[in-house]
Amino acid sequence: MPLPFGLKLKRTRRYTVSSKSCLVARIQLLNNEFVEFTLSVESTGQESLEAVAQRLELREVTYFSLWYYNKQNQRRWVDLEKPLKKQLDKYALEPTVYFGVVFYVPSVSQLQQEITRYQYYLQLKKDILEGSIPCTLEQAIQLAGLAVQADFGDFDQYESQDFLQKFALFPVGWLQDEKVLEEATQKVALLHQKYRGLTAPDAEMLYMQEVERMDGYGEESYPAKDSQGSDISIGACLEGIFVKHKNGRHPVVFRWHDIANMSHNKSFFALELANKEETIQFQTEDMETAKYIWRLCVARHKFYRLNQCNLQTQTVTVNPIRRRSSSRMSLPKPQPYVMPPPPQLHYNGHYTEPYASSQDNLFVPNQNGYYCHSQTSLDRAQIDLNGRIRNGSVYSAHSTNSLNNPQPYLQPSPMSSNPSITGSDVMRPDYLPSHRHSAVIPPSYRPTPDYETVMKQLNRGLVHAERQSHSLRNLNIGSSYAYSRPAALVYSQPEIREHAQLPSPAAAHCPFSLSYSFHSPSPYPYPAERRPVVGAVSVPELTNAQLQAQDYPSPNIMRTQVYRPPPPYPPPRPANSTPDLSRHLYISSSNPDLITRRVHHSVQTFQEDSLPVAHSLQEVSEPLTAARHAQLHKRNSIEVAGLSHGLEGLRLKERTLSASAAEVAPRAVSVGSQPSVFTERTQREGPEEAEGLRYGHKKSLSDATMLIHSSEEEEDEDFEEESGARAPPARAREPRPGLAQDPPGCPRVLLAGPLHILEPKAHVPDAEKRMMDSSPVRTTAEAQRPWRDGLLMPSMSESDLTTSGRYRARRDSLKKRPVSDLLSGKKNIVEGLPPLGGMKKTRVDAKKIGPLKLAALNGLSLSRVPLPDEGKEVATRATNDERCKILEQRLEQGMVFTEYERILKKRLVDGECSTARLPENAERNRFQDVLPYDDVRVELVPTKENNTGYINASHIKVSVSGIEWDYIATQGPLQNTCQDFWQMVWEQGIAIIAMVTAEEEGGREKSFRYWPRLGSRHNTVTYGRFKITTRFRTDSGCYATTGLKMKHLLTGQERTVWHLQYTDWPEHGCPEDLKGFLSYLEEIQSVRRHTNSTSDPQSPNPPLLVHCSAGVGRTGVVILSEIMIACLEHNEVLDIPRVLDMLRQQRMMLVQTLCQYTFVYRVLIQFLKSSRLI
């Protein structure tokens, strides 16, 4: 059967299109460097030009274009609107393309960007050396002296001036006499000495100003014949179209305002003059040449005519003394000068200005007369254009790997395998690419995917985008009172609802703000996609592992973390634990009366049909060992019970509650006598639950009772007997009066977890110590911290994940009131609550309210104490879908707020920062309240300038399933700490630097630019003993990857350092593009695997260096997200607050705001959803 379109099958019976769909564009820059870009066959010249512009950090692309040698060895400018490959295949002598200036300005002072002036300088120097601009001997010597000063600096840096003889100083083939050449070179050497102290930008500016006054500046001519058949050269210049006769006659210039029309017919090019009724014709070599000259002149005419007023009236003063600094990232502010539209060289259609003849688009057309999109398309979104250039072409490239389709995943167009010539460099504070990620180039470690892979990613992205449109608002909770009332009625503090972007008191000391919206109508709305994510599919193995996440064997996982394995989750159902009430708990306690009224109505109108409960409690009391019971205390800093919706083992039967819990002496209960809440077991009891165990309840405020925060004082744990229950053993009835209070002076250490109890070291059971030592997620420095040895670590079961009860660490917000006042003194707090006392409720009555809500109203929190003999039990891990539901539920019900507030921001003890507080180190700290702990700080080899070896950086080590994750968290380097920063990189063997900020945000410096800018002079910068060179840079949408070479000047050793900068973090809040942030984490993983594969396998893997501004906020987000994703990949227990607490014990205040903490949840949810789609 014949194939369509005339396709022929090979003997392999396969047809591969990948080899025919790509183009490797080899482009020579003005500094004679070659770069290569892998594009699709449909990629236009404009896309290639923009790739070069990104590579050079060039914003003013107006003046530049690409050209090639045709088969007659003549220069021809590329038609930017047409596919580049077709033009090269049809006309080019070789596939090499050249970058250069196509439009010259009357004065180089009009150029806004320094890199533009530098490229202009290279172009003009090239014109002089190639003889395109004729000059005299004196002019050549003068220009050569300026060029040497600009290129090589002051003469006293060199032993002699003999090196000048090795470089081309004069036009090629111009000076044949060796004696004259030597004399001219000596004069250049004298001028070089004369220009001592002149900076490179100054010398370049003087060079360009000298050239722009010379004849031939901005001219481009082509051979032709006039009407008499005489040989002439015709071309365009600044003033108009010139004609130069080769017989010695004076040149003739037809000024732009005198030309009424231009046309071409066959091999003739004609000018129609406005003041004369005549047409002047010129004959060219052939029809193609005539058409090309016509297109070029039309473009020049339109460009200069529209620029005439602007260029003459513009009063832009460029300071020639402004130094080109590799560390300066701020760009000149936009001037009122408006660029004209790109000139049009058309093949078809009509020129709408004064011309009527047909023409073709060589440059990007623009009907509005403004040259805006050629600049803004590279650095900002075209909001008014809806992501399209004004001629209708889509912003993204038509390349194979950046598919020009609406999809959430877009792979950047890969480049050749040479890592030294990759990339684009567009990282600036005001440069946030939004739509155009067309010709970006990935680094060498990410190879080009084949055609099938690209198509799979395309299809996957479309499916994912479709699924992403669904929201969580379909939960059947609309009938509850809180959801049917306006937000101002439901939430107790409208100022939080109305001003969610303002900084919270908890974050008032830092430049971050609280941006989590408590009043969002959709608890977890999917963010609007602002741009396609480039590089999001670069590491498929990172997310593919999620497919088998639940199949991983777990005999060695959490052996000592004992808990009851939760049953599988049922199908989706309406909310199950009064989210309308739980939302109130996480706003504030400063206005309890408002909360009381809202909760009162919510409880009063709560009906069974509004929230049908499909889940019941598996366990509501804690089995206590004798040693555990001996040290049990009750904390009444109000733990909020967020009850798991994944436990179905028990059904609530009965509840009793003492009228005054604080006044009742502690009494023990047996296994069969459970106070407050009765449970009917539907699962087989474990053998470890023997009669000698005791059950105790943690008194914690429920949704309704978290109206007033009590004090930090601790009172006895109350044990109550249910009437009619079996009598407990005598030994269990004995009261333990010694347990009423904490020992005086005992510090309270609150850890993230459902149970926080501080005990003397001698009373910690061995099993609990083993649990601390063998936790799957633990810090390697944990055992070195004495204060942690006295803590009972919380259980890390999946049920704990859904338990919102964790103590608040914000003690300044707690009111010191005994719990007896809460339970007995305020009888009218919530009228809808059952009366306190020994009243019993039947099963039917309890069922009306529901077990989850009823247990919450009684202050119960799900938590298990690990038993010594339960260490062998291994629980079944939840699937990705279940984990995703759990995380979404926590966000939806607002549990994250109190969860975050209970995590200590810094150590309570053993947190000395003596070295950081030394007077000589004060200037090395960006913020005086963010300091590294002495025991985990990065210690440098002391130097004369830094005799303490101090840098504001901390080691962070976390072990996940036996794999150690090693980080260094540090602040953004200051100008005076760049040398220390690179010394740390060298001594610690850093291979990857993850930067999560821009150099400047909102006019404030976030990090000094410590690496050289690509395109700057020699791409190098030196800090002390280290020389840093930028080899390449590639922009991938929301992040940029830069390859750096680091050389130790004393030893000559060299290393490669990867710099990964996330560029999409807003000044306030957190990124909305979750997949973009995930693609950044995947890029870190890709580079980490690449560096580890090339390093010595016997040496330990180097730590990942992460920094933002202070080195705690965004830095903590990156580290916490990576570790939690690793837990998901290894099917470990997901306990985000406990891991964050571990991190904060090694560097204070990591994940600085609630907004950032919530962002980590959203990232994990997005990760689970993405892994589910693969």
From Swiss-Prot:
Record field: compositional bias (Acidic residues): 712-722
Cellular compartment(s): Cytoplasm, Cytoskeleton
Keywords linked to the UniProt accession: Cytoplasm, Cytoskeleton, Hydrolase, Phosphoprotein, Protein phosphatase
Annotated gene: PTPN21
Official protein name in the record: Tyrosine-protein phosphatase non-receptor type 21
Superkingdom field: Eukaryota
Swiss-Prot/TrEMBL catalytic activity: O-phospho-L-tyrosyl-[protein] + H2O = L-tyrosyl-[protein] + phosphate
Catalytic residues, chain numbering: 1108 (phosphocysteine intermediate)
GO molecular function annotations of the record: protein tyrosine phosphatase activity
InterPro entries associated with the record: Band_41_domain, FERM/acyl-CoA-bd_prot_sf, FERM_2, FERM_central, FERM_CS, FERM_domain, FERM_N, FERM_PH-like_C
Residue ranges with Basic and acidic residues bias: 681-692
